[in-house]
Amino acid sequence: QTVFPGRDVCCTGFGWPFLGWEIEGSNEYVWTHLPAKKWNALAVVRPTWVAEQVESLLSHPGVIGVKPYYSLIGHDASSRDKYIEASIFDFLPHHQLEVLNDHKAWVTMHVPKADRLGHPENQREIKEIRNMYPDIKLVIAHFGRSYTKPHAEEGILPLADDPGLYWDNSAVLNPEVHALAMEHIGPDRIMYGTDNPMFMMRGRRKWEVRSYTNHTSQDFYFNTNRESPEIEAGYTLY
């Protein structure tokens, strides 16, 4: 009621999409516990799973779709980005997409590539999914990882006119990106995302042209350039 007064709100959750975690156990947890909260669940899906396994995931009450991720191609304890340059179809293959389309299921897509959504292969493959599997509810996470305005211009603008493509704004803090998305996509196809538990930390983000830096007062591996205690004391929740 504080954030969305007078509106009915439903949350959607899923497990941790990394092979260092128990994928099957996390899926079972979300479809067991989320319906009791009247939340929707997404199942984390391994790219190696056959069509029948995806069918089985979607048969559970409350499971409305899947969460694929390129890190599920193979485990590397040193980096989640070993497969960042993969094709979308390397971690969400066509036989799974066929099942998802038949069920009119939801897919939250964290796009690969260091160049983010604007990479030509991502643009081509998103359009291919939309053409071949039009009944999938395709949601592009983090505005296609568009954390800076140049990335948003390259990634969002070529796809913004597709009325069947949806977006979430989780982890996007740049007001210029939000303004661009509101202007070219509009509020009807943008969903609010928290990216929790990641963004339950306190901190702030700085950006300059195409680069950005996350700062936090917590001892995360990436937090090597700490700001002064006086600045950190003023951090808010991401």
Predicted region positions:
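Well-ordered, non-membrane alpha-helical segments in soluble/globular domains
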Residues: 1, 23-32, 86-95, 120-126, ...
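Catalytic domains of carbohydrate-active enzymes, especially glycoside hydrolases
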Residues: 1-15
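Short, conserved catalytic or adaptor-binding loops enriched in Gly and charged residues
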Residues: 3-4, 33-34, 157-161
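Active-site gating/metal-coordination segments in enzymes
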Residues: 10, 18-115, 166
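Short, solvent-exposed loop/turn segments at secondary-structure junctions
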Residues: 16-20, 46-49, 71-75, 113-116, ...
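Distinct, well-ordered alpha-helical segments
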Residues: 23-28, 51-58, 78, 116-132, ...
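H/E-rich (His + Asp/Glu) clusters that bind or coordinate divalent metals
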Residues: 141-238
